[in-house]
Curated annotation (Swiss-Prot):
Listed name of the protein: Thiol:disulfide interchange protein DsbG
InterPro entries for this protein: DiS-bond_Isoase_DsbC/G, DiS-bond_isomerase_DsbC/G_N, DiS-bond_isomerase_DsbC/G_N_sf, Thiol:disulfide_interchange, Thioredoxin-like_fold, Thioredoxin-like_sf
Organism lineage: Bacteria, Pseudomonadati, Pseudomonadota, Gammaproteobacteria, Pseudomonadales
Pfam annotation, one family: Thioredoxin_2
Tagged with keyword Cytoplasm: no
Residues of the signal peptide: 1-24
Protein origin, superkingdom: Bacteria
Similarity comment: Belongs to the thioredoxin family. DsbC subfamily.
Protein's cellular compartments: Periplasm
Functional summary from the UniProt entry: Involved in disulfide bond formation. Functions probably as a disulfide isomerase with a narrower substrate specificity than DsbC. DsbG is maintained in a reduced state by DsbD.
């Protein structure tokens, strides 16, 4: 899954819980219930032209606009455009689906087992799912040095183990270290010369952290490392798969 760019705004609209409760208070028409029974979450309703009634749904982390016909017997799915080409589905989906979904995902990343890289009071936070054996994670670590060293950005490495057989044990070694931040810094700075050793026996608490990180990564549709999540200038959450190109760094990390 790749969250649609420029549609996900933090802080707008209701939370998923509140939106769900608001919709639950309504008596859903049969065609809308049919869509719900197929696995979609109905998160809210909205006004639509010409007697249509709009419903915002979420299915597998994607927004879906539903339009109930005036007779209440049929439902249309997809985007609705006016004569000027304006997408009338965009604002309701952003407000009722993508904004609260992004907020929920950001909160889950905040609560995950991450290792800080940079000052705690940095004005900008960037999350990335990181594997100790990932050369592109090291590349992004190096790319970000000017921003991190200047105190402008804090990277938060959500550790996972997916690349090699010893990746999980190496992530465990970092998380279980007496100083995870220094251990990660030393590992990334050394690059191929890193002396990081996989943990021979992963403590149950650390294994639980890694399992939670992996579950979160999968739920967010990330399939490779680094999977980078950040807020753009408008406060909208964006996703970057893999090490970014040089001309993308300012978008992800802010002004240098």
């Amino acid at each position: 899954m790749r969250l649609p760019r420029n549609l996900i705004t933090l802080g707008l609209g209701l939370t998923l819980l509140n939106a769900g409760l608001a919709t639950a208070a309504e008596e859903l028409p049969a065609p809308i219930r049919m869509v719900q029974e197929k696995g979609a979450r109905i998160l809210g309703s909205f006004d639509a032209p010409d007697g249509l009634r709009g419903y915002a749904a979420e299915y597998q982390n994607q927004g879906m606009a539903l339009y109930l016909t005036p007779d209440g017997k049929h439902v249309l799915t997809g985007h609705l455009f006016d004569a000027q080409g304006k997408d009338l589905s965009r604002e309701p989906l952003e407000r009722l689906v993508y904004a609260p979904l992004a907020k929920e995902m950001w909160q889950k990343m905040e609560q995950s087992a991450w290792i800080a890289d940079g000052r705690a009071d940095a004005p900008r936070v960037v999350y990335l799912f990181s594997d100790p054996n990932c050369p592109y994670c090291t590349m992004f670590w190096e790319q970000a040095r000017p921003w991190v060293d200047a105190g402008k950005v804090q990277l938060r490495h959500i550790m996972v183990g997916i690349i090699r057989e010893d990746s999980e044990a190496k992530s465990a070694a970092l998380l279980a270290s007496k100083d995870p931040q220094k251990a990660l810094h030393d590992h990334e700075q050394a690059g191929k010369a890193s002396t990081l050793k996989p943990l021979a026996k992963i403590p149950a608490a650390v294994r639980k952290q890694l399992a939670g990180n992996m579950e979160l990564m999968e739920s967010m549709g990330a399939a490779a490392t680094p999977a980078i999540f950040y807020l753009n200038a408008e406060g909208r959450m964006q996703q970057q798969q893999g090490a970014p190109q040089p001309d993308q760094l300012a978008e992800i990390l802010g002004p240098r």
